[in-house]
Amino acid sequence: DVAPSRGLGDVYKRQDEYFEKVQDSNLMQNKEGGTYRPTFYCLRDNKTSLLWMVPLSSRVEKFKAIHDKQVAKYGKCLTIVLGEFDGKEAAFLLQNMFPIREYYLDHIHTRNNNPVPVKHSIHREVTTRMKKIRQLHSRGKKVVFPDIDRLEQIMLAEVKDNATE
């Protein structure tokens, strides 16, 4: 059900317009100190055509500590995947994932004008965990910080409005 958006491992920046539109204080801000951050790993939901954005963080030590605490307590950590992106360690923050329309994507993350892919093993892990998180969420478990039901409804309403225009 969840597949890469335009190819395996596409990573994007998000437009400020999305943040202004949805007004969710639990979404990660777009800019830190004037630079484009965070970057988002992008997966398409084939049922709705919406994209699910998973923020990447370079603050690996911070999220490794949270990850390790979850593993010690529960035997696993569903919401943070530790891995590599663009030659650097990164934390994929499923706890901060959210739905978006392709319209709100700003630009793809590139190196030397080529899209930077996410390793297939990380893609598999993120995809598997995202499915589990969405299943837990559908059963009423609060697993992610943003209000993904509200955000999904806003995006689906836009898709519907654009289809009738």
Q: What do the predicted segments below correspond to?
A:
Residues K13-T35:
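An N-terminal domain-cap segment
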Residues T39-L43:
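Short beta-strand-centered aromatic/proline hotspots
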